[in-house]
Amino acid sequence: MIIKNPIIKGKFIERLNRFEAYVEIDGIKTLVHVPNTGRLKEILVKGADVLLEVREKKGRKTPYELAFAYKGKRLISIDSQVPNKVFLESIKKGIVEEFRGYELVEKEKSFGNSKFDIKLTNGKEICYIEVKGVTLEVDGVAKFPDAPTERGRKHLKELIKVKEEGMRAAVVFLIQMDDIKYFTPNDEQDPQFGQFLREAFTKGVEVYAYTCDVGENFINLKNRVQVVL
C-alpha cells in the first residue's frame, strides 16, 4: 500500500491524550493527530524519529497524521486503519495463499453482535476474518494487545460462533513491522484475551500472523510467521 500524501519528518515530544501529540517539525512544536488509541509507550518516546502524513482537509484540527515511528532502526507503522487496508488489498491481489479462491471479497460485514473486517464468499462457503494490527515488539517477538481489549475478546467469542455455525473463521495479526521471530498473545497486559485466543484455536478458529515490509511511504504484506500460543 502506497501512501500518496506528502510525508515529512519530525521528532516526537509528548502525547497529550489518545488522539493528539506534540512533534517537533523543523524546530517548531506542532500538534499532530495520533491514529491509534493504543498505548504505544515503547514507541512514542521523547526524541523518537517519526514520519507524518500531511492530510490537507477542511475541519481537521491539524493536517499532520502520525503515520510511522522509528524504534531504534526499526520502522513501525502505527496507523490502526492500515492493517485492514493492507490485508484486504493483499487478498484481492491473491497474495495471501491461505485465503485464495474466493469469488467475493467484502469488508466490514456483520455477524451476530459483531462487525468483522473481511467476509469471503465462494458459493456456499463463507469465511469471516478479523484483522488486528500489532505494533508491540519485545526482543523480536510481536505481541497483542498492548492494553486490555474488551472489543478484541468479543470478536474472538463471535468467531467461535461463526465456526460453530459451519463457516470458516480466522483472526489475523498483522504485524506493522519486519524482522519478527514469532507472534504470541500478550498475557501480561490482557490474560483473558490470551485465554480466549487459545480457546478459539482449539475450537477451530484459524490464527495467523504476518509481518510487513515498511518504508517511509509504504507498507506491504511480507511473510507469515509462527504463532506461539
Swiss-Prot record:
Listed GO MF terms: DNA binding
InterPro entries cross-referenced by the UniProt entry: SfsA (IPR005224), SfsA_C (IPR040452), SfsA_N (IPR041465)
Stated family: Belongs to the SfsA family.
Name of the molecule in the record: Sugar fermentation stimulation protein homolog
Organism: Caldanaerobacter subterraneus subsp. tengcongensis (strain DSM 15242 / JCM 11007 / NBRC 100824 / MB4)
